[in-house]
Amino acid sequence: MAAPVSEPTVARQKLLALLGQVQTYVFQIELLRRCDPHIGRGNAPPTEAERASGAGAAASSEAGPGGPAGAFLTPLSVTLELLLEYAWREGERLLGSLETFATAGDVAVFFTETMGLARPCPYHQRVRLDTYGGTVHMELCFLHDVENFLKQLNYCHLITPSRGATALERVREFMVGAVGSGLIVPPELSDPSHPCAVCFEELCVTANQGATIAAAWRTVSVTTSPSRRRCGWTPTSVRRYLPHAAGLSDADRAGALRVGPCAGPDRGGRRAAPPVAENDSVRKEADALLEAHDVFQATTPGLYAISELRFWLASGDRAGQTTMDAFASNLTALARELQQETAAVAVELALFGRRAEHFDRAFGSHLAALDMVDALIIGGQATSPDDQIEALIRACYDHHLTTPLLRRLVSPEQCDEEALRRVLARMGAGAGGPKGGAGPDDDGDRVAVEEGARGLGAPGGGGEDEAPSPRARGTGPETWGDIATQAAADVRERRRLYADRLTKRSLASLGRCVREQRGELEKMLRVSVHGEVLPATFAAVANGFAARALLAALTAGAGTVIDNRSAPGVFDAHRFMRASLLRHQVDPALLPSITHRFFELVNGPLFDHSTHSFAQPPNTALYYSVENVGLLPHLKEELARFIMGAGGSGADWAVSEFQRFYCFDGISGITPTQRAAWRYIRELIIATTLFASVYRCGELELRRPDCSRPTSEGRYRYPPGVYLTYDSDCPLVAIVESAPDGCIGPRSVVVYDRDVFSILYSVLQHLAPRLPDGGHDGPP
């Protein structure tokens, strides 16, 4: 019997099913925006009740970044929420445009409204972030702008008040149009030269050949968010999908199947060019010699050389393509769009008796007036992005390989033809030699075969057919004529070797350039698909701010709430605890552990590698946090040594005044405020460490507000400890007692404070009855 499926799994499956349905609805909206408005008007519009229910569903998704009642967000819930709001908003706009078209009847006006041609670019969103160090203004224009802002907010979360969550609402508004429009990323939103956090994490685990992360980061191209996909079109799509189209009669369907691209083979495909016969007389002569030979005859080296050269010429696909064939192939590719349009019109006439006025047809004159680059980016109905990329690369190669040197290297059959001609000439000159014996030019035949097999010609000019010099044969004394002949041969050989090396280097440079440009073309032309990186990043940061508000709301309903912020007599407790702790210093053996605690508290909610199944230390998560925002090296060094620099000795670590812990009055600027927050957090860590050491009450846990995750019942458990809220109004919350299940309820005891030492004294008062010695004396 199979194990029962858990409730979270069932809920996730239902959300995925709903997400698929909403994605389909959004896709239909995008199609109707581009289709003939008569088609949209042909269907009955939704009733007012249906439209009201859609508005209610969208309104329920507008509870803000934290969701309804601060619900815990997931990438799936964020994506579904964005899709619902986009579907409702664009659906209402489309219905309004269809109603306007029913009155005016202007197709151009309909497409201008639905496609937003008269509206400004919707992908510009101003964002304002209020921090304790000042106000930051930014503009979101691209997807990487959203991710960068979320990572920066994650880094600055400890100096951002709870109202900083309002900035996430502006981010969400941008994501509704950018991510909620479906799986396909609008081309104007994606910039592959800005990698995401996942790309950086992958970069950190790959070999870098000694390069710094900053240097390697500049060469990374984004492949995860968004990711690029191959897509194509086949002329058999109509034949495959038309039989399943609803609302059509069998006669109309059969008539449509007899026309269009489904009526025959792909006429837009490339036609293989027939092999081109060159040097027919040489090949015929060689074939005649080979046909006259049989196994009962002795094989001469020259005949064997001819056979070997014919083998090299016959092996492989070396069929050339004439200029006219290439021109005809290009014309066929250019005509593919026209053929597709003609076939589509034929199918429409067969099915509906009229030619539909879609967006690309209504604005055909505008599309035809675009320049080559814009037309390349827009693409076509019958040409996939990969077809465009291959055509551009093929045209580039065809242009550059017209150079004789490159053509000779990439067309080795020319070398084989020349070698075959030389062998035949030598055999004709030595025809009077003894049959079956080795003629005087056997070495020359062997050299010719080797040159032909290697594709090595003599591009330097004439002289290739000359016999080896007497010095090369090692016969006879040298004469001035022999020396001149040898010098000329050496010049030709050096020229050949230089040309060969130059050709190979040029071809390698061309290949390297084409590979780089191919990558750029893939970035520009291939279809990009949204991943889960952006919704996951938004959910993590939003959950961090929602956790602050949730902790404040839950602790306010505890059974016992002690507010030291306005209680009398707290100053004496502050003086007593401060004086008792400053007399001690932290054990050096504890510095590594409290350093990791410091890294855990200053890190944001986005990078939580320390909570994974295969947990990593907190310094790893903080490393990803600071590297993704481009923190300068000197600040990273300062942050790494922040705890070690204090060491818990002396009074330098106690930086806050009474009831002014986490107070940033008089400090301006992000970096100075961030440094002040680090000092406050260091003070809290050292004070709690000394408190546990001096009073021997066990380790006092320091926790973040987002340390708790909802259970399957939606409840949050907060273990006892001191919670740093990052809110200057109430930065410290101590839960000294809670219910047995860990939830905050009537039995819980909570302490609010703005002072480290007074809240520690309150904790000591609560723990004193449990201590073996009853605790130390209180303040005088």
Curated annotation (Swiss-Prot):
Segments forming a coiled coil: none
GO MF terms held by the record: ATP binding; metal ion binding
List of residues binding ATP: F691, A692, S693, V694, Y695, R696, C697, G698
Disordered, as annotated region: 41-66, 428-447, 452-483
Keyword ATP-binding: yes
Described purpose of this protein according to its UniProt entry: Component of the molecular motor that translocates viral genomic DNA in empty capsid during DNA packaging. Forms a tripartite terminase complex together with TRM2 and TRM3 in the host cytoplasm. Once the complex reaches the host nucleus, it interacts with the capsid portal vertex. This portal forms a ring in which genomic DNA is translocated into the capsid. TRM1 carries an endonuclease activity that plays an important role for the cleavage of concatemeric viral DNA into unit length genomes.
Designated name of the protein: Tripartite terminase subunit 1
